[in-house]
Regions:
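Terminal low-complexity/charged segments
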Residues: 1-250, 411-425, 491, 500-533
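Metal/cofactor-centered catalytic core regions of large enzymes
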Residues: 63, 193-570
């Protein structure tokens, strides 16, 4: 019998995490911990803690065994955690408990073949210069998330092939997500007062011409042509800089510079109350605001253990599937513009259909893009009478429109030649890169979180998951087109089975009481006052919860310390 490591006891006070003695893991009654049992048997005292936490399999691993652990988790026949979906880090310096290490790295592993998820936490021993081995040579998809954790949290990943900042500019003076960096802690380099002396010569000065040697990203060949595309370029559909290496007309390499639109959502979220971050989640991707709301509130509701009324569940599914269609329509229009298959015509057509969806959104909440409609405990308001009538008309018209788009594009020789055989990714490549959503399904991986790890009531719906095997741009196009049809199928079932009842929970500690109740109930007034002043108190614990968004897996990792604000929000 193995004995637990003495160091395990340093982690006994982590919020919500119960330390499990190694022999006890095997005796857990549910088969969901069979994976943690096998891991503990393999690594013994190097597993600091293991078991279920908020329903999720969680293990704590010593950093010196992390590489070996990751390779074992990926290749072992009984585990087969072939994908890494997320990497982040936690700065625990402001937690009021325990004497453990300041920094921890957090990994989310996924087994598509076994429909299992595993959260891996690695405490880092050096508080001043935290470092941990990079997993990029095991999971290709770790490269960018590790760069982000280094950039924003200051954790160095030894052995990383290209460890540099990814969001903040090089030379930024701090790592913003560390707890000792305040919100707005950076110095603003410009004055806002035109009378200040620094503006006296504005527009009149001539700077001396100086020769600046070009700085190339790692791996670029100076013998080829290097072109800067963006950050302001119509083909990037946003503020994005691409350093493109060309050999003649062939693109050899692209190095993306992503940070121009970095808005600090995580730092902001850690300084906002749980209920207030719903409005920020819209802005993470305004083309998928409903889905952003949905993923966030599901995570918090699972931490709270709150039950959602059946009517609210069905309304959420209707709205998020409408949002999926709207997002796919916008993708289709911009994709056609870039490929120039039929010029601007398809963009105008899909905009017409997308406007009908936005009209439906406006009917329920008054907003079209940043809707903030899905709230903690339910939805903002019930469906108005005219909503279902207009939705029924849309459900009749939309399948015909999708067929029209396919005829316009699929029968176009130009469309075919510019998509078929282009951007081919094999099944193994998309899994190891950590790609999700239509990218994953376009390369032959039959996986959809709505079906394979159902949430929010999706287990009650009958729909197909479209999969293609070619792995090229055309395959991903066909997957998204069929996904719109399947979303219509889900919405039709939801409308048919829409129950009566409340549209939000009656737990007054989670959702505000209705206005009429405030006039007659002092208790309702007290609940309203406490929710608006103190906020919603989430019990200590942590959770990673993911949904199938329009662009792929959208996961939220929340570390709660018992207050009204998330200690860590990722």
């Amino acid at each position: 019998m193995l004995n637990p490591s003495p160091r395990v006891r340093e982690y006994e006070n982590i919020p919500g995490v119960v330390r499990l003695d190694i022999p006890a893991v095997a005796s857990l009654p549910t088969g969901e911990t069979a994976d943690t049992t096998r891991i503990v048997e393999r690594f013994g005292e190097d597993i600091l803690a293991a078991g279920l936490h908020n329903g999720a399999q969680t293990v704590y691993v010593k950093p010196e065994r992390l590489l070996e652990f990751a390779e074992f988790a990926r290749t072992d026949e009984k585990l087969r955690y072939e994908a890494l979906t997320d990497v982040t880090a936690i700065d625990r310096s402001e937690l009021p408990i325990g004497n453990g290490e300041r920094f921890q790295t957090v990994y989310q592993l996924r087994s598509y073949s076994r429909k299992q998820h595993l959260t891996v936490i690695c405490p880092l021993p050096n508080d001043d210069e935290p470092a941990v081995p990079s997993l990029a040579n095991i999971y290709k998809g770790a490269e960018w998330p590790e760069r982000e954790a280094y950039d924003l949290m200051g954790v160095r990943f030894t052995g990383h092939p290209d460890l540099r900042r990814i969001m903040m500019p090089e030379g930024w003076p701090n790592h913003p997500l560390q707890k000792n960096v305040p919100v707005g802690g950076e110095e603003v380099p410009f004055s806002m007062t035109w009378s200040d002396p620094e503006f006296a010569s504005l527009g009149t000065q001539i700077l001396p011409a100086t020769s600046v040697p070009p700085t190339l990203p790692p791996g670029m060949n100076r013998e080829n042509m290097i072109i800067n595309m963006g950050p302001h370029h119509p083909s990037t559909h946003g503020v994005l800089r691409l350093v493109v290496e060309l050999d003649g007309e062939t693109v050899v390499k692209i190095d993306p510079d992503l940070g121009y639109l970095h808005s600090g959502f995580e730092k902001t979220g850690e300084n906002k109350r749980y209920k207030d971050f719903v409005y920020y989640s819209d802005r993470m991707d305004y083309l998928s605001a409903m889905l952003n709301n949905f993923g966030y509130v599901l995570t918090i509701e699972k931490l709270l253990g709150v039950d959602i009324p059946p009517r609210a569940q069905v309304i959420r599914i209707i709205m998020t599937e409408l949002q999926r269609i709207a997002s796919h329509l916008f993708w289709l229009g911009t994709h056609v513009m870039d490929v120039s298959g039929t010029g601007m015509s398809v963009m105008m057509y899909v905009t017409r259909e997308r406007e009908r969806i936005l009209d439906l959104f406006e009917m329920v909440c008054g907003a079209r893009l940043t809707v903030s409609y899905i709230r903690l405990g339910g939805v903002y308001r019930d469906l108005p009478d005219a909503f279902l009538t207009n939705l029924a008309d849309f459900l009749v018209a939309m399948p015909v429109r999708i067929d029209e788009y396919e005829r316009m594009l699929t029968e176009s020789p130009l469309w075919d030649v510019r998509l078929q055989g282009i951007g081919v990714l094999s099944r193994d490549e998309v899994i190891n890169m950590g790609l999700t959503g239509p990218m994953l399904r376009g390369s032959g991986v039959d996986w959809d979180l709505r079906r394979d790890m159902p949430y929010g009531g999706f287990e009650n719906y009958d729909f197909k998951v479209p999969v293609a095997t070619e792995g090229d741009c055309f395959a991903r196009y066909t997957v998204r087109m069929e996904e719109m049809r399947q979303s219509l199928r889900i919405i039709s079932q939801a409308v048919k089975n829409l129950p009566d009842g409340p549209f939000k929970t009656e737990d007054r500690k989670v959702a505000l009481p209705p206005r009429a109740e405030l006039d007659v109930s002092m208790e309702a007034l007290i609940h309203h006052f406490k929710l608006m002043t103190e906020g919603l108190l989430v019990p200590p614990g942590m959770l990673y919860h993911a949904i199938e968004s329009s662009k792929g897996e959208l996961g939220y990792f929340v570390y709660a310390d018992g207050s009204a604000k998330p200690y860590r929000l990722h």
